Amino acid sequence: KDRPWKYQDLADAMRAINSEDECNDTYGRIRMYQALLLKNPTGIKIPSERTVYRVMDEIGLVHRPKRKPNGITKADREARKSDDLLKREFKADKPLEKCVTDITEIKAKDGKLYVSAIFDCFDSSVLGLAMETNMKATLCEHTLDNAYLAHPDLRGAIVHSDRGRQYTSETYRQALSKYGIIQSMNSDGGRCHDNARCESMWARMKSELLYDRYNTESLTTDELRVLIWRYFISYWNNRRICSANGGLPPMIKRQRYYQSLGLAA
């Protein structure tokens, strides 16, 4: 008589995690292990990462490789630049202290969609998001507007960017000044690794949400807006396992930080 597989309950729990959100099928062994620890399913002893990987392999839960996008902003050599205040130190001890911002582009059926976001270095959360069919400075201004509307305590924070002309524009600088936000820029317009934090986040979004899942050139820019907004504001911020946060989604890490201070997030 066949004995039941000792990892059947674990495999079922993994399948449940995989099916909870469309993008969870990109979880590798580390994030799957962290998701199991966070959810702590009843009656299941969580094994080692290595065993988690073996069971994932056995039941066919494998994630796809990532492709990395290239930076698209172009420097305005004549414009006034701001100092590099972060100097590649992207770790923050508390929320709304250090942030990074960038733009990426996605080809659509009716043109290109440009996506701008502000990420918090503390927990990788998206504080502000804006999307337009052009790369004008108002795109970055609207990103700041949305971030400040959602997080008024952003006043006094550092927001770091590359030296693209959108970020050296008077429109963007005036928005920073209006909200009391401090500007920081890459030390050299040619050093893309200074903004690697944002590039990494764009790569994750494109890999998990778009690549091998949708043909973006068959979707309109409006359809893409809905997908991307839902991915970042709902999934990324609240449910996506983030290994850099010790396996916690950004808002859970933030909530625990404020709880440790006796404050509400």
Regions found by a protein language model. Name each.
Residues S177-Y179, A203-A265:
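C-terminal domain-tail junction helix/linker
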Residues W5, I72-A75, S161-R163, S169-R173, ...:
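RNase H-like two-metal-ion nuclease catalytic core shared by retroviral integrases
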Residues R88-L127, T133-M135:
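An active-site-proximal beta-strand-loop segment
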Residues K107, G111, L129-P152, T168:
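Active-site beta-loop-alpha junctions of metal-dependent nucleic acid enzymes
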Residues V62, I181-I182:
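Residue-level detector of anion-binding/catalytic polar loops
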